[in-house]
């Protein structure tokens, strides 16, 4: 019994350290956070970005383990959701720009002169998919 519990603890800690190291390596090697700061012109808030990443990883891990529920009113949940969506969108935009995905995609599919149309198609598709998910799946589950 004790050996199996110690093994589970060992595997859990090993997995957590591996995922955490991969997350930090992803953000560091890809240069996502510096590019995000450059795009938003917020280089003076480097410590705030570092603290947000660390705090987000720690709180996310804690919430995953304990499965606590935050009972928020809709007046608090909506702004928090909007800010979270804004952050994820900006992070995705920074990742896309760092990897130079859109120019390569536009060149390969022959839309080099119409890259703005490609970008708007991606944005409208993302908005439509999100609305479909929230309006259909959330209400019907």
From Swiss-Prot:
Keywords: Cell membrane, Membrane, Sporulation, Transmembrane, Transmembrane helix. The chain crosses the membrane at residues 7-27, 45-65, 75-95, 115-135. It is a multi-pass membrane protein. One of its GO terms (biological process) is sporulation resulting in formation of a cellular spore. GO terms for cellular component: plasma membrane. The keyword Membrane applies. Signal peptide: none annotated. InterPro entries: SpoVAB. It is found in: Cell membrane. The keyword Ubl conjugation does not apply. Coiled coil: none annotated. This is Stage V sporulation protein AB.
């Amino acid at each position: 019994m004790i050996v199996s519990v110690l093994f589970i603890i060992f595997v859990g800690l090993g997995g957590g350290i591996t995922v955490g190291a991969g997350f930090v390596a992803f953000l560091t090697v890809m240069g996502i956070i510096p590019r995000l700061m450059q795009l938003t012109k917020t280089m003076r808030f480097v410590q705030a970005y570092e603290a947000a990443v660390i705090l987000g990883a720690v709180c996310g891990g804690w919430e995953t383990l304990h499965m606590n529920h935050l009972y928020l009113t809709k007046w608090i949940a909506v702004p928090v959701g909007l800010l979270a969506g804004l952050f994820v969108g900006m992070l995705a935009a920074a990742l896309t720009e760092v990897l130079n995905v859109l120019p390569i995609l536009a060149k390969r599919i022959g839309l080099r002169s119409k890259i703005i149309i490609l970008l708007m198609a991606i944005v409208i598709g993302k908005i439509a998919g999100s609305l479909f998910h929230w309006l259909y799946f959330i209400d019907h589950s």
